[in-house]
């Protein structure tokens, strides 16, 4: 049974009216999948918070300590993009724990998904871009440290480069990070990944999919992975207000299928996290995210 991390009490965190982050999607995704019968309630699990030691494998003790004490400056709040509260920290810890536990479920069932996650802009000592703790890094680091796998490939197809993940795993031969992102988009100071494909604004869908097919194959061959982490951000949608690319819902579906089909055919456990999506039309964001779940179900 494919397991899905979701906490109905924490994932949809209250934000000030008019905030541009579409937090409501974290409730709408499971609601829609349940309504259409694509998943069952038995597949959903509420993550149990992992101990602090797990987070210290990725994040600096001083940073975690300040977060726990609520010692967050106004400048840090602006970098996070969220108003600070202890409830927000509880949310971030729970999401990271969910991604780690998805890794364990993926080993058992072939694949697992987190309704949230993909917080790839979080660094060891700081957060930015709606990311405070790095769930991909926490999950992958645990899988590697505990000997569950020897090599992880992260396929990061969010329109924004996962700069935090790149920094955390720089020089780590057991973690291969492939990022295909917008060249002119946030973050404006890029980090160095194992494979970076930086796309110009308004890049055509046909060219996008052609490039992805080529560089995905290159990444799998270079990484020779035992596990895949898929950052499946849907902010590459043509209607996304932050994305600057021209990929249709059909194109995103083809993208997801390319990644998931490849991992499945190689018999590799896969963890999918949702990443970004900032269209004015929330239904388009939710539909695109839901398709990722459906595609995983069809191949695993």
Residue ranges and their predicted role:
Residues 1-137:
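Metal-dependent C-N hydrolase catalytic cores
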Residues 74-300:
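A general "terminal functional-core" signal
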């Amino acid at each position: 049974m494919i397991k899905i991390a979701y906490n109905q009490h924490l994932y949809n965190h209250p934000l000030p009216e008019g905030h541009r982050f579409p937090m409501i999607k974290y409730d709408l995704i499971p609601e829609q999948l349940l309504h259409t019968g694509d998943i069952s309630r038995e597949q959903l699990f509420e993550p149990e918070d992992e101990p602090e030691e797990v987070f210290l494998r990725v994040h600096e003790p001083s940073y975690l300590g300040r977060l726990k004490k609520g010692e967050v400056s106004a400048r840090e709040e602006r970098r996070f993009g969220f108003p600070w509260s202890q409830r927000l920290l509880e949310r971030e810890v729970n999401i990271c724990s969910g991604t780690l536990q998805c890794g364990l479920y993926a080993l058992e069932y072939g694949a697992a998904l987190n309704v949230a996650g993909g917080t790839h802009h979080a660094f060891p000592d700081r957060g930015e871009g709606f990311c405070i703790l790095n769930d991909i890094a926490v999950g992958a680091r645990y899988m590697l440290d505990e000997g569950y796998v020897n090599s992880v490939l992260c396929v990061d197809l969010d329109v924004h480069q996962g700069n935090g993940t790149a920094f955390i795993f720089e020089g780590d031969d057991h973690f291969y990070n492939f990022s295909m992102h917008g060249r002119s988009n946030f973050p404006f100071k890029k980090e160095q990944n194992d494979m970076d494909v930086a796309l110009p604004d308004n890049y055509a869908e046909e060219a996008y999919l052609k490039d992805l097919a080529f560089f995905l194959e290159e990444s799998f061959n270079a990484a020779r992975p035992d596990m895949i982490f898929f950052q499946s951000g849907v902010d590459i949608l043509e209607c996304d207000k932050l994305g600057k690319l021209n990929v249709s819902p059909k194109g995103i579906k083809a993208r997801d299928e390319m990644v998931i089909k490849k991992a499945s055919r190689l018999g590799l456990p896969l963890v999918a996290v949702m990443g970004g999506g900032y269209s004015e039309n929330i239904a388009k964001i939710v539909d695109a995210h839901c398709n990722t779940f459906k595609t995983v179900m069809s191949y695993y």
